[in-house]
UniProtKB/Swiss-Prot annotation:
The gene is ruvA. Residues 154-198 are annotated as: Domain III. Residues 65-143 are annotated as: Domain II. One of its GO terms (molecular function) is ATP binding. GO terms for biological process: DNA recombination; DNA repair. Residues 1-64 are annotated as: Domain I. It comes from the Bacteria. Belongs to the RuvA family. InterPro entries: DNA_helicase_Holl-junc_RuvA_I, NA-bd_OB-fold, RuvA, RuvA_2-like, RuvA_C, RuvA_C_sf. Keywords: Cytoplasm, DNA damage, DNA recombination, DNA repair, DNA-binding. The keyword Ion transport does not apply. It is found in: Cytoplasm. This is Holliday junction branch migration complex subunit RuvA.
Length: 198
């Protein structure tokens, strides 16, 4: 039904962003990676959309790139992988890191995702390894690093926590740029608070 939504970025919550278009605020669930790339409130953005309709739920899932949206759809095609687990996998590291892990059979990397056990990780690798183009491996190698070096999910959670404490999104984003991104959410928040109160 939806291909993409263009509008003003209005804010972030734990697992979704809000985009206003023609007076309507759209609640869009997204990955930590897309959350961490959001501009300041009020700026125009374009988010590619997948609508999920179930008997008890209708939701919009959006991403900053078609590539990330396509990966989300691929993950949903795996039996046992729901939207929440797919978003978690897209949040633990950059997209190329995830592809690299699938292509090389790195179950340990995939198991870092919420709700992803060894059995499902193995199924993801088995079913998606051949669907991801082999030449993508070369593109992924140069960008692959340990997930703790690109902890976008922790950053998005830290951002939400700082905003809930009364800091503006701009203030929070500014200090989070300088924190050690390999730390846990708790330590990232502590470091940010030291900078904000200093």
């Amino acid at each position: 039904m939806y291909e993409y939504i263009k509008g003003e970025y209005m804010g972030i919550n734990k697992d979704y962003i809000i985009i206003e278009n023609n007076g309507i605020g759209y609640k869009i669930f997204t990955s930590g990676a897309t959350m961490s790339s959001m501009p300041c409130c009020g700026e125009k953005i374009k988010i590619y959309i997948e609508q999920i309709v179930r008997e008890d739920f209708i939701g919009l899932y959006g991403f900053e790139s078609l590539e990330e949206l396509d990966m989300f759809k691929l993950l949903l095609s795996i039996n046992g992988v729901g939207a929440k687990a797919a978003l978690s996998l897209l949040s633990i590291s950059r997209l190329n890191n995830l592809k690299y892990a699938i292509i090389t059979g790195d179950e340990k990397h995939l198991c870092r995702g919420t709700g992803i056990g060894k059995k499902i990780a193995g199924r993801i690798i088995l079913e998606l390894k051949d669907k991801l183009k082999s030449d993508e491996l070369l593109n992924c190698i140069d960008e692959f690093d340990d997930v703790t070096q690109d902890n976008s999910l922790a950053l998005s959670e830290a951002l939400s926590a700082l905003i809930s404490l009364g800091y503006t999104e701009k203030e929070a984003e500014k200090v989070l740029k300088d924190v050690d991104k390999s730390e846990s959410v708790e330590n990232i928040i502590k470091s940010a608070l030291v900078k904000l109160m200093g």
